[in-house]
Amino acid sequence: MVKLDKIYTRGGDKGKTSLGNGERVDKNSIRVEAFGTVDETNAVLGIAIVNLKSPLKEMIFRIQNDLFDLGADLCVPDNKKLDYEPLRINQFQVDRLEEE
């Protein structure tokens, strides 16, 4: 699990943001765009759930959970040594999403 103790840096904007491992990247980087899009998708699904009934609701809950995992994967680059094992989207999750 990604551990974020705080959501601010007090370092000013300067067009940069921090990834889950502390690495600073441009806010317009493809990685930041990707996890922003994943987060927006998850938010839209959350709004859609309000008026849905099972089993569609249960399917969307599973998709949302997978999107949280994907966002965590995008937030922590694979090329850095971490003190913990990051989440990774696996083939089971991909196959299940494609079936649904």
What are the residue ranges of the model-derived segments?
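Phosphate/pyrophosphate-binding loop motifs in nucleotide- or prenyl diphosphate-using proteins
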Residues: 1-100
